Amino acid sequence: GRLKQCTIVLTRGCNLRCDFCFEKEAGYRAHDRLSLDEVKRIVDLCGDANVRYVFLTGGEPLTYPHLLDVLRYIKEEHPSITPTIATNGVLLEDMGFCQRLIDCGLRYLDISMKGADATEWKRATGFDGYAKQLRAISNIVSTELEFTCSMVITEENVTRVCEAVQAAHESGARHD
């Protein structure tokens, strides 16, 4: 069989402090990240293996200082690879940043929802970012970039998952 995807953990650093995240145990070490050369070597191996999707994740991959360089490298050196980012989306409230990611080659995005409202979001993450995430979804919708919304289901939010889906829908996310 063919290896279809590869996940690259770019950084352990994150701008949130989600109570359910595996990075919590690791200490959210922002300095614990791959070098640009290490990422390029991994991408080259993926290209040699005809990998179709490279998932860039973390921590929070949007905080990785060489992210745009990685996307450009994939676009220029391995155009058959579809780069995908799994993110909390908070930094995508900046429409200019969204556009730079797309211009550099981002082709797919997964935004991890953290709650059905601002209170639940802050309780889960330690950060008041609910409105920023909804703006980010609206920004992404306006770009035509393909994306999904996902959500870690916990005992605390299981009864409100449908409300979180509705909030994403009201921000412009479609369900196809």
Task: Please annotate each region the language model reported.
Residues 98-117, 173-176:
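Non-cysteine beta-strand/loop elements that form the S-adenosyl-L-methionine
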Residues 30-34, 125-132:
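Alpha-helix N-cap and loop-to-helix initiation/capping positions
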Residues 15, 91, 116, 154-156:
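Short, solvent-exposed loop/turn segments at secondary-structure junctions
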Residues 1-87, 92-107:
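Conserved alpha-helical substructure of the radical SAM core
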Residues 49-55, 78-84, 107-108, 131-176:
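Conserved C-terminal portion of the radical SAM core fold
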Residues 34, 65, 128, 156-159:
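Residue-level signal for the nucleotide or nucleotide-sugar donor/cofactor binding architecture
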Residues 10, 87, 113, 151-153:
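Short beta-strand/turn micro-motifs composed of small residues
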Residues 61-63, 89-92, 111-127:
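Conserved radical SAM core fold
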